């Protein structure tokens, strides 16, 4: 029994020792961080220590924590306290476990010693030393203590059957097994403790890192708040300040807290700021806005304000957080940048417009160059044809030869007119054509156009001119283009009218409805120089006829290029269909309008309306002889205010195929003559049209001349080698006949010359005069590279009684002028080696300086041989006349700008050459 009780006590002691190793409050004290299952009963193993939850920092919430200093600090404090508590609790638990293990081991060793001691005591073998010699005293004390316990117990008797050696041996073996099991449990527990320590160390690293990040973020936040030039604050739902931070405070904190913006500040922008905050609070959505404040406290400044709503845990809005930053300088810079961008945009737009202008200018220049090239290439060979035909007309020809020659000249004139029409049309469409503004008299222009048309008239028509009294005596406009329009329209009217009347009517009208802002193209400065006022007038011009009329269905396409009323009209009357198209474009270019009304078999009326500037009534043109060729050199009544003209074909029988002569009823004691035209204001006829050539036939005294004046007029033509007499004894000069026949042939008729006058006495006189003049003939230099043009010029000069030297380019011309003295130079513009313009500049430089240094610098070799004589520096200006096939107005201006004195366009005619020689040699 005693042994049984001992066994039970030992087992209870083992359980008690094992149970004491695990305190009952482990789970609660560790805040349930560890779940340790305590051993109970005969459980020999210890379950693993596991971690239910791991505290890991949520990095996504870190920015939210930083938005509020109080929240971040609170979270950080709680986290640190929790971590410290966990660490302290773990250390305490480990210490307790180690303490329990040590106590358990000591108890196990004590039990083992007790058992051994009892075993030795029962076997009476005290001489045997225990396993642990050093603990012999402990065994003796334990044995004595055991005896005392047994004696003081309830005196339970020990049965002898259990007090045997075998029993105690078995008991020792069982205790040894228990000791091994306890040792194994201790080893496993130590391993678990080591693993737990390692796990705790690994778990503590994120907590330390999070703590470090939080401290760093907090330091960064403090750094921003201390250095950023911003204002931060928190306001409740009534927009009263609960917190504010300002780097540069202008008010004390106690003056702000508990108040609204309106209660604190006064001035512009305050109410807007409060309304903006209230709007954000109501909508519950963060927003930002620039607001300019104008207050007495800090003046006018612009702030960028960012406002966000604040919610509690229940999701209710409790106020707002806001941040404000001054952006006044940025706003100013932004406005400057916007202004700069606007200026850059304007500059780019101007550059774009400039590039467009440059492109248009280049296109215009190319168009001009094309027109100049086209004119030059066509007119150059045509000059040879027309010039040679004109020279041939001055020779003795029979009737058939003269008819053929007239057809040749007429065809050449038609080709030239066609070329002029095409060039005019091209110049208008390409924008090359420029209008001139000069003073002229409308009555004289109308009279001149009608006289010219009557001179070549072969039909029984009456030409009328009717100018209203309110038409000004003198106006300003492009007289050459107006004459061109009138000439084309009156020519068409005559062409399609077989009998009846053709006329021109002028009248002043009020400003028409189609007027545009840019209707007037005249230059204001030029008008002021001419003494004009700003008064303008609209003049309506009607060109009417009683001809065949135009079908109504043909009117819409009448002004289109290369279009005629019908194919039958084109075959019967000819023409290219360009005349009306050119007239319409010229009228529109001058700011007017051209219309037509017509009825078949009743006639047509072409009406164009143009604006004109009007001069003062007492400021007439200085040149009272603008159309002196229309009147006799003797004094005549002034007809500048005359308003009605009428011309009838008094020489109609000349153009009839079978008529023998001129009826005395039509031409009593009078005959029609030709004479050169003096153009308005001294202007040379525009080389781009054939106006000057088509108007070569002029009428003296309204188209007639007395017989007494005939011989005098004929005497002015020494170059005429022959004279012819008609049936009535009237005589024509050969040059006059040639010009008249040329005009008549353009209408399809030929002028019949009936007989030749023998004037031997006149020839002898002319021969004597020629011998006298040979000693004083002027020296003329022709600078031309085209052999055909040289041949034509020589022949014309021969007809005019002159000779000339030839130079093929500008270098040869300079060499010739250096070695000889000339009275006149006819200079071609386009030549190889050295063109006419540059040669003229070098000649003018020589006249100014007396040396050829400029020519030498240009590479011209002016060295002379010993036999050549060097001409002295001329005292007078050498006349240099340009001869070119370029018909652009810029070409003539360029010639004048380079020092030339006049301009002759090709094809050169005897009339043009004669006028030039008369102007510069007489």
UniProtKB/Swiss-Prot annotation:
Its Enzyme Commission number(s) read 2.7.13.3
Q: Name a biological process GO annotation.
A: cytokinin-activated signaling pathway
SMART domains under this entry? HATPase_c, HisKA, REC
The cross-references to InterPro entries, in alphabetical order and at most eight, read:
CheY-like_superfamily (IPR011006), HATPase_C_sf (IPR036890), His_kinase_dom (IPR005467), HisK_dim/P_dom (IPR003661), HisK_dim/P_sf (IPR036097), PAS-like_dom_sf (IPR035965), Sig_transdc_His_kin-like_C (IPR004358), Sig_transdc_resp-reg_receiver (IPR001789)
> Residues bearing 4-aspartylphosphate?
828
According to the UniProt entry, the coiled-coil residues are: 86-120, 169-205
Name of the top EC class for this enzyme: transferase
- Report domain Histidine kinase positions: 373-614
Q: Which positions does the record annotate as the modified residue Phosphohistidine?
A: 376
Note down the stretches annotated as region Disordered: 620-639, 728-773
Q: How does it sit in the membrane?
A: Peripheral membrane protein
**Bias type Low complexity, positions:** 738-747
Q: Does the keyword Ribonucleoprotein apply?
A: no
Molecular functions per Gene Ontology: metal ion binding; phosphorelay sensor kinase activity; protein histidine kinase activity
Q: Where is the composition biased (Basic and acidic residues)?
A: 761-773
Annotated keywords: Abscisic acid signaling pathway, Cell membrane, Coiled coil, Cytoplasm, Developmental protein, Ethylene signaling pathway, Kinase, Magnesium, Membrane, Metal-binding, Phosphoprotein, Plant defense, Transferase
Q: What does this protein do?
A: Functions as a histidine kinase and transmits the stress signal to a downstream MAPK cascade. This protein undergoes an ATP-dependent autophosphorylation at a conserved histidine residue in the kinase core, and a phosphoryl group is then transferred to a conserved aspartate residue in the receiver domain. Negative regulator of the ETR1-dependent abscisic acid (ABA) and ethylene signaling pathway that inhibits the root elongation. Promotes stomatal closure.
Q: How does it assemble?
A: Interacts with AHP1, APH2, APH3, APH5 and APH6, but not with APH4.
Name of the protein in its database record? Histidine kinase 5
Source species: Arabidopsis thaliana (Mouse-ear cress)
């Amino acid at each position: 029994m005693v042994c049984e009780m001992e066994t039970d006590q030992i087992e209870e002691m083992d359980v008690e020792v094992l149970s004491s190793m695990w305190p009952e409050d482990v789970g609660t004290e560790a805040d349930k961080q560890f779940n340790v299952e305590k051993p109970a009963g005969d459980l020999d193993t210890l379950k693993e220590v596991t971690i239910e939850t791991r505290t890991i920092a949520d990095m996504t919430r870190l920015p939210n924590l930083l938005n509020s200093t109080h929240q971040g600090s609170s979270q950080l404090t709680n986290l640190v306290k929790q971590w410290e508590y966990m660490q302290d609790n773990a250390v305490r638990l480990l210490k307790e476990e180690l303490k329990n293990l040590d106590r358990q081991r000591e108890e196990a060793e004590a039990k083992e010693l007790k058992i051994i001691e009892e075993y030795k005591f029962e076997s009476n073998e005290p001489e045997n030393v225990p396993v642990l010699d050093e603990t012999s005293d402990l065994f003796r004390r334990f044995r004595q203590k055991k005896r005392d316990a047994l004696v003081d117990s309830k005196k339970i008797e020990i049965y002898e059957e259990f007090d045997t050696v075998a029993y105690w041996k078995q008991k020792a073996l069982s205790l040894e097994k228990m000791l091994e099991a306890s040792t194994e449990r201790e080893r496993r527990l130590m391993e678990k403790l080591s693993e737990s320590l390692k796990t705790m160390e690994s778990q503590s690293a994120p907590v330390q890192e999070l703590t470090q990040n939080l401290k760093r973020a907090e330091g960064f936040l403090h750094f921003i708040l201390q250095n950023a030039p911003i204002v931060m604050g928190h306001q409740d739902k009534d927009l009263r300040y609960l917190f504010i931070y300002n780097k540069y405070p202008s008010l004390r904190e106690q003056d702000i807290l508990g108040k609204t913006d309106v209660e604190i500040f006064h001035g512009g922008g305050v109410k807007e700021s409060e309304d903006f905050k209230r709007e954000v609070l109501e909508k519950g959505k963060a927003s930002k806005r620039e607001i300019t404040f104008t207050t007495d406290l800090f003046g006018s400044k612009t702030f960028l304000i960012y406002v966000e709503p604040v919610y509690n845990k229940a999701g209710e809005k409790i106020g707002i957080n806001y941040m404000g930053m001054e952006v006044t300088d940025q706003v100013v810079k932004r406005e400057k940048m916007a202004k700069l961008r606007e200026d850059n945009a304007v500059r780019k737009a101007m550059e774009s417009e400039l590039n467009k202008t440059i492109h248009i200018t280049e296109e215009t220049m190319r168009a001009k160059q094309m027109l100049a090239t086209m004119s030059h290439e066509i007119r150059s060979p045509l000059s040879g044809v027309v010039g040679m035909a004109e020279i041939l007309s001055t020779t003795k020809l029979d009737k058939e030869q003269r008819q053929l020659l007239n057809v040749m000249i007429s065809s050449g004139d038609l080709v030239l007119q066609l070329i002029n029409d095409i060039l005019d049309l091209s110049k208008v469409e390409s924008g090359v054509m420029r209008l001139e503004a000069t003073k002229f008299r409308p009555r004289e222009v109308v009279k001149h156009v009608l006289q010219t048309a009557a001179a070549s008239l072969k039909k029984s028509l009456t030409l009328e001119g009717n100018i209203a009294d309110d038409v000004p005596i003198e106006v300003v406009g492009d007289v050459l283009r107006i004459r061109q329009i009138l000439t084309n329209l009156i020519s068409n009217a005559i062409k399609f009218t077989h009998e009846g009347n053709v006329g021109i009517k002028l009248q002043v009208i009020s400003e028409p409805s189609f007027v545009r802002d840019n209707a007037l193209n005249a230059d204001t400065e030029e008008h002021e120089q001419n003494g004009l006022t700003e008064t303008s007038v609209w003049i309506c011009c009607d060109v009417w006829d009683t001809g065949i009329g135009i079908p109504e269905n043909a009117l819409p396409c009448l002004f289109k290029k290369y279009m005629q009323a019908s194919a039958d009209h084109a075959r019967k009357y000819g023409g290219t269909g360009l005349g009306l198209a050119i007239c319409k474009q010229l009228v529109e270019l001058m700011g007017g309008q051209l219309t037509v009304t017509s009825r078949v078999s009743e006639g047509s009326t072409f009406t164009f309306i143009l604006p004109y500037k009007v001069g003062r009534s007492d400021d007439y043109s200085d040149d009272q002889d603008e159309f002196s060729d229309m009147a006799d050199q003797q004094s005549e009544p002034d007809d500048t205010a005359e308003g009605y003209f009428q011309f009838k074909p008094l020489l109609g029988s000349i153009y009839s195929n079978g008529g023998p002569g001129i009826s005395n009823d039509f031409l009593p004691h009078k005959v029609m003559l030709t004479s050169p035209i003096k153009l308005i204001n001294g202007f040379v006829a525009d080389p781009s049209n054939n106006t000057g050539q088509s108007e070569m036939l002029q009428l003296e005294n309204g188209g007639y001349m007395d017989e007494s004046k005939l011989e005098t007029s004929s005497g002015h033509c020494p170059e005429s080698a022959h004279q012819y007499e008609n049936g009535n004894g009237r005589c024509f000069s050969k040059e006059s006949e040639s010009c008249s026949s040329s005009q008549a042939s353009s209408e399809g008729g030929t002028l019949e010359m009936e007989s030749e006058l023998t004037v031997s006495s006149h020839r002898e006189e002319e021969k004597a005069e020629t011998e006298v003049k040979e000693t004083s003939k002027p020296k003329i230099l022709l600078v031309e590279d085209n052999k055909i043009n040289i041949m034509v010029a020589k022949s014309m000069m021969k007809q005019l009684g002159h000779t000339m030297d030839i130079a093929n380019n500008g270098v040869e011309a300079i060499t010739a002028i250096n070695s000889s003295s000339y009275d006149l130079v006819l200079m071609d513009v386009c030549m190889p080696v050295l063109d006419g313009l540059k040669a003229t500049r070098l000649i003018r430089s020589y006249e100014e300086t007396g040396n050829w240094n400029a020519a030498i610098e240009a590479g011209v070799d002016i060295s002379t041989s010993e036999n050549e004589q060097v001409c002295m520096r001329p005292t007078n200006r050498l006349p240099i006349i340009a001869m070119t096939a370029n018909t652009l107005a810029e070409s003539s201006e360029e010639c004048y700008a380079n020092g030339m004195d006049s301009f002759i366009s090709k094809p050169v005619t005897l009339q043009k050459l004669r006028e030039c020689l008369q102007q510069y040699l007489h």
